[in-house]
Amino acid sequence: MAITIKKVSSKKELKTFIRFNYELYKENPYSVPDLYDDMLNTFSPKKNAAFEFCEAEYFLAYKDNKVVGRIAGIINKRANETWNKKEVRFGWIDFLDDIEISRALLDAVAQWGKSKGMDTIQGPLGFTDFDAEGMLVEGFDQLSTMATIYNYPYYPQHMEKLGFEKDADWVEYKIYIPDAIPDKHKRISDLIQRKFNLKVKKYTSGKKIAAEYGQAIFELMNEAYAPLYGFSALSQGQINQYIKMYLPIVDLRMVTLVTDAEDKLVAVGISMPSLSEALQKAKGRLLPMGWYHLLKVLFLHKYPPMLDLLLVAVKPEYQNKGVNALLFSDLIPVYQQLGFKYAESNPELELNGKVQAQWEYFKTCLLYTSPSPRDRSVSR
């Protein structure tokens, strides 16, 4: 029976769009489900500040009157202007192992993009870099994280059969926490601190760090990440949203700021305990008992052995000068004290040599691109 594609046009259909991922991966031990309410907010123009410069459509695939796939089409106007491109993004793509389903989903986004004047389709990408991006091509037997996409091995096989080509590589790393700060690391840290007159700042109040450095943290991100592939600067609306969303829930012991002699922010490192197992137990829902599993980690500090390195950003003029050593000289003793055994990085561009040497190779994600949003049945 033919595949039918339907544009999501009601709240009921949007709920179906979100829940399809839960159903597809409910028996998979490595997938980490997003929180349902977070997804509703992400897809809502009223709740997601990225809609200031993005537009989106969501599509469901049906076969025999059953949902068999989903995909989001996104146009990030700011990214297109920054990189002088006309790209439509596809994201939140899931499908059964049937090439006609994946073809129909990607065709739907391609044709929508073409109707908006776009000439290239690319993904998986979200609205911005704060959304998960890339398609897993290795490490299918590793537990995912809340910041990454998990997919079945047949996904990248479909992409290649449909004529898509790799456009970028991301890699993730597992970093084992040392028993003691390496002597060389400590010497570099001390030297850099004296040479540039830098200071390590710590906070115990979420309100205080938000008031004094919340804006500066995300402005530093915009500055540090500007040259990276496909990055689009956070708007003021997004910055306000993320300050309210993230700073109240992080354990400030795992947040380290580095400032110069004038207290201007030079670098920031933000970590948090892995929520992967808690999110799996919650199964995407805070109710009836999902809140308890997250509460144990976030507020009762019942930490698993793994932590996530959410954010490391260094001001461009201080990059490649050892400032990262200063961050981790402060953070490593905290990790030891809290009982963490290893950390997992967020996906990092494989060509980002400024950070690659620090980590052990762990697993790889890919970004795919196709040169023009035309009929996906045409081989290229």
Question: PLM ranges: what are they?
Answer:
Residues 24-58, 63, 73-81, 216-310:
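A conserved beta-strand-loop-helix scaffold within acyl/acetyltransferase catalytic domains
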Residues 2-43, 110:
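TRNA-binding/sensing appendages of the translation machinery
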Residues 14, 77-80, 129-131, 180, ...:
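Flexible loop/turn segments at secondary-structure boundaries
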Residues 81-163, 282-361, 365:
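Acyl-donor binding region in acyl/amide transferases
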Residues 368-375:
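Conserved small/polar residues in nucleotide/adenosyl-binding loops
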Residues 3, 149-229:
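Acyltransferase donor/substrate-recognition loop-hinge adjacent to the catalytic core
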Residues 379-380:
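Hydrophobic alpha-helical segments, chiefly the membrane-spanning helices
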